[in-house]
Amino acid sequence: MKLHELKPSEGSRKERNRVGRGIGSGNGKTSGKGHKGQNARSGGGVRPGFEGGQMPLFQRLPKRGFTNINRKDYAVINLDRLNSFDEGTEVTPELLLETGAISKLKAGVKILGNGKLEKKLTVKANKFSASAKEAIEAAGGTAEVI
């Protein structure tokens, strides 16, 4: 196969439908909008959730819960991602950010226990799940809360 032989796959490219261009096109006159009414007008249509004047479902249901302003959002990382570091490395939130293991520090870093850790590491983080702490210590490393 050569570059000049490449063709788009069947059905992946579709021609634009030009409406209002004569009755023979199948989309002339009313351009597929039917006769009159709110939806036939320019800019016409109803907002999402509108039920024709009936009290919409989202307004019939009670409000629930609240947003906790004191919530702390942690950058989470699993144990299997820590295997990319060399044996004996001191893993800090700054190092994780530098290497791209996490994209933002947020309120801190939490280490979760998914995966298997095969290296002895000193891990410093704001929080550890119980299983993560256990696995780090089982691998001969230490888990320090900062």
Swiss-Prot record:
One BP term from GO: translation
Region feature (Disordered): 1-57
Feature: compositional bias, Basic and acidic residues: 1-18
Disulfide bonds: none
Gene Ontology terms for molecular function: rRNA binding; structural constituent of ribosome
Stated role: Binds to the 23S rRNA.
Family under the similarity heading: Belongs to the universal ribosomal protein uL15 family.
Protein name: Large ribosomal subunit protein uL15
Organism: Bacillus pumilus (strain SAFR-032)
Protein encoded by which gene: rplO
